[in-house]
Swiss-Prot record:
Essential transporter for growth and development under abiotic stress. Mediates shoot branching by promoting the outgrowth of lateral shoots. Required for salt tolerance via Na/K homeostasis, at least partly by regulating SKC1/OsHKT1;5. Necessary for hypodermal suberization of roots, which contributes to formation of the apoplastic barrier. Disulfide bonds: none annotated. It holds the Pfam family ABC2_membrane. Residues 484-691 form the ABC transmembrane type-2 domain. Keywords: ATP-binding, Cell membrane, Developmental protein, Membrane, Nucleotide-binding, Stress response, Transmembrane, Transmembrane helix, Transport. Residues 1-17 have a biased composition (Basic and acidic residues). ATP binds at residues 175-182. This is ABC transporter G family member 5. GO terms for cellular component: Casparian strip; plasma membrane; suberin network. Residues 1-25, 71-116 are annotated as: Disordered. Residues 121-382 form the ABC transporter domain. It is found in: Cell membrane. PROSITE patterns: ABC_TRANSPORTER_1, ABC_TRANSPORTER_2.
């Protein structure tokens, strides 16, 4: 633990007097919290210093130019930086250059009143309600029981929540399950539709565009959504390639990743895979820190986290919050939800917001918890964690009829009495939003998209409006770079999970072997013709059933995709194309494997040309089948829902393909299903490839009696029957006379709509269509906002 905290640049590692008195190790412990002294910041944890800004001209400076100037300054250039520079002192003593205003940066009240802050996130009267349905209300015939209580039509998840978060501090949202913690984090992170959320969220007093917020912020979900087969370093490097501008050299991106690995305490695990249930990887705490690192790779100005310590032991949770404290002190606004912080974690938090049934029941620094509850008539006992006491009391008050309301009213009265109406805990913004972004760039914040030159920051123009959505580039990299990075990442994942391809190849080879041995060397008799029909129907449908394993591929990546695209890491079109490129080589291998196993063994016609056409139609079938499964994976949300849909739909496709019933016999009201059947076109294609030659004869002379009651007659009798037929019809029909050619058989099967090449291209077109539909499903179904 001490080695981990020692690496963090924002903490002086000399033990505090309390640590020395109690003989505690140098573990970053911020002191035991006692009654009326629950929050005592580390004495050597220094605030950010604001040096006097250099003179600037009244001209707009792009973020790209600011970033370039910062890089020049770091490399020793004399280029001036036209924004305030914030520095962090690492020593134990306070340097003389730190202004007296900084001394109160971590005062008990959370900061001195009126002290200018670079960034202040303020939220006022946030209210959010959702429709509430009774269980089973979707059934039209269900009526509520007489004794069933009437439920309100709307359920309020947030009820007039107000507060503010500042750079350099951590604001923690606490409450029991269902109190509205995650909902509030989503509201602040712009993950709730504007038409559903009431109230205002501003930064430095200015409303912010959603596209700009995506650029300067990051959101860390409660779940660890990572690729299990990538190492820690690879995961962060891919995040850097997605979030950092392409004008930044690769060596600088690698340097940023190395620094972040050190900051997160992941140096020993850098070359370890993330892991999952079947592959051993990093620990739970390390995985959580990697999740945070992925979203802070571009050093965001604002960081929102949904229960980052959930599921971790106390040591791992403390390490995670310590990292967040370092991020906050680097000049970021950090807002997180947390269930129940320990003593040590509480010492790292600057501001608490307790929720109960969507209402604010306490808002302020940890140091004010004891007097707050003392004034409420519920003093916190000595040596008890104040947050545990508060959460237990809030839970107890929720069982009372007006308990939550009384506590919320007490909080409102407390705020009015101690902080005044409309008066926060200090930290008034000392600059406009544009100036704040400019200052963040000068501190080394690599704002995503900053080098596109599309978003300008007028550091000296106080009257200029904040950047609009039209001036903010949505994506850092161009389309082809995104596709290249996504393709490379997918190939690495595929290479490290060879068992997935091996299982598919084994399934194809086993199926081909079984078909080859059953339909070995078919002859050109009527019986051989019927056996060919069965082989083609089973073979073509096998292609589609084999592709059903593509369904869980995207479903396993679904939430990773949602996390990455929520902040415009890449375009959805880039993902679809890279997904297609990575999957295509395996389809080629599977097609050749199946064709080599069956074509010559069954004795199909066409020679070399026929073989390569057979390979092409098998490949087209794999292409269309994988596209169909991919499309469904974008529509359904769970693999247990997807497989029944895939299997049942493919069964219908086979039923209407023309094998079981000819097109001429299908009822007219079902004929449309025949034409959308994916099996129809490859089935008819291989049939025409086999029976399209008019010189091949499949029924000669007495063979016409095969598969009829006359088949059991002696050969001599069959010959006499042929002679009688010849005399009656006036046509000479001998034992060698060709009765049915290949084209004749195709007409009998009603395979006359399309030629074999048309069937091939239609099958290929189905594959493209399903991938386009997959892209549309990602556009419509991958929204990251609540309604």
């Amino acid at each position: 633990m001490s080695r981990f905290v020692d690496k963090l640049p924002l903490f002086d590692r000399r033990p505090s007097p309390m640590e020395e008195a109690e003989g505690l190790p140098r573990s970053g412990y911020l002191g035991q919290l006692h009654h009326h002294q629950y929050y005592q910041p580390h004495s050597n944890m220094l605030p950010l210093e604001q040096s006097p800004p250099t003179s600037t001209k009244h001209t707009s400076v792009t973020l790209a130019q600011l970033l370039k100037r910062v890089n020049d300054a770091r490399s020793g250039s004399s280029t001036p930086i036209s924004s305030p520079r914030y520095t962090i002192e690492l020593g134990g003593s306070k340097p003389e250059s730190v202004s007296s205003e900084s001394d109160d940066h971590h005062s008990d009240d959370g900061g001195s009143e009126g002290q200018p802050r670079a960034l202040v996130l303020k939220f006022t009267d946030l209210t959010y309600s959702v429709k509430q349905r009774r269980k089973g209300s979707c059934l039209p015939f269900r009526r509520a029981a007489a004794d069933e209580p009437e439920l309100p039509a709307m359920r309020t998840l947030l009820d007039g929540i107000s507060g503010e978060a500042r750079d350099g501090e951590i604001m923690a949202v606490l409450g029991a399950s269902g109190s509205g913690k995650s909902t509030l984090i989503d509201a602040l992170a712009n993950r709730i539709a504007k038409e559903s959320l009431h109230g205002s969220v501003t930064i430095n007093g200015e409303s912010i565009d959603s596209n700009l917020l995506k650029v300067i912020s990051a959101y860390v979900r409660q779940e660890d959504l990572l690729y299990p087969m990538l190492t820690v370093e690879e995961t962060l490097m891919f995040a850097a390639e997605f979030r950092l501008p392409r004008s930044l050299p690769t060596r600088e991106k690698k340097k940023r990743v190395k620094e972040l690995i050190d900051q997160l305490g992941l140096k020993r695990a850098a070359n370890t895979i993330i892991g999952d249930e079947g592959h051993r990887g990093v620990s739970g705490g390390e995985r959580r820190r990697v999740s945070i690192g992925v979203d802070i790779i571009h050093n965001p100005i604002m960081l929102f986290l949904d229960e980052p310590t959930s599921g971790l032991d106390s040591t791992s949770a403390f390490m995670v919050v310590t990292v967040l404290k370092a991020i906050a002190q680097s000049g970021s606004v950090v807002v997180m939800s947390i269930h129940q912080p320990s003593y040590r974690i509480l010492g790292l938090l600057d501001r608490l917001l307790f929720l109960s049934r969507g209402k604010t029941v306490y808002y302020g620094p940890p140091s004010e918890l004891p007097p707050f509850f003392l004034d409420f008539g519920k003093p916190i006992p000595d040596n008890e964690n104040p947050t545990e006491f508060a959460l237990d009391l809030i839970k107890e008050m929720e069982t009372e009829t007006e308990g939550t309301k009384r506590l919320a009213e007490h909080n409102a009265a407390w705020q009015l009495k101690h902080h005044g109406e409309g008066r926060g805990y200090g930290g008034k913004p000392g600059m406009s939003l544009k100036e704040a972004i400019s200052a963040s760039i000068s501190r080394g914040k690599l704002v995503s998209g900053a080098t596109d030159g599309t978003m300008s920051v007028a550091a000296s123009d106080h009257s200029a409006p904040p950047p609009s959505s039209s001036s903010v580039s949505k994506f850092v990299n161009p389309f082809w770079i995104e596709m290249g990075v996504l393709t490379r990442r997918a190939f690495i994942n595929t290479k490290r999970t060879p068992e997935v391809f091996i299982i598919r190849l084994a399934a194809v080879l086993v199926t081909g072997f079984i078909l080859a041995t059953i339909f070995w060397r078919l002859d050109e008799s009527p019986k051989g013709v019927q056996e060919r029909l069965g082989f083609f129907a089973i073979a073509m449908s096998t292609m589609y059933y084999t592709c059903s394993d593509a369904l869980p591929v995207f479903l396993s990546e679904r939430y990773i995709f949602l996390r990455e695209t929520a902040y415009n890491a890449y375009r959805r079109s880039s993902y679809v194309l890279s997904h297609t490129i990575v999957g295509f080589p395996s389809l080629v291998v599977l097609s050749f494997a199946f064709a080599l196993t069956t074509f010559f063994s069954v004795g199909l016609a066409g020679g070399v040309n026929g073989f390569f056409y057979f390979v092409a139609i098998v490949l087209a079938s794999f292409w269309a089948g994988s596209g169909f499964a991919t499309f469904l994976s974008g529509v359904v949300t769970h693999v247990m829902l997807g497989f029944p849909v895939v299997l049942s739909t493919l069964a219908y496709f086979l039923l209407f393909s023309g094998f079981f019933i000819n097109r001429d016999r299908i009822p007219r009201y079902w004929l449309w299903f025949h034409y959308i059947s994916l099996v129809k076109y490859p089935y008819e294609a291989v049939m025409q490839n086999e029976f399209g030659d008019p010189t091949r004869c499949f029924v000669r002379g007495v063979q016409m009696f095969d598969n009829t009651p006359l088949a059991a007659l002696p050969a001599a009798v069959k010959v006499r029957v042929l002679q009688s037929m010849s005399a009656s019809l006036g046509v000479n029909i001998g034992t060698g006379t060709c009765i049915t050619t290949g084209p004749d058989f195709l007409k009998q099967q009603a395979i006359t709509d399309f030629g074999k090449w048309e069937c091939l291209w239609i099958t290929v077109a189905w594959g493209f269509l399903f991938r386009i539909l997959f892209y549309i499903s990602l556009l419509l179904g991958s929204r990251n906002k609540r309604r």
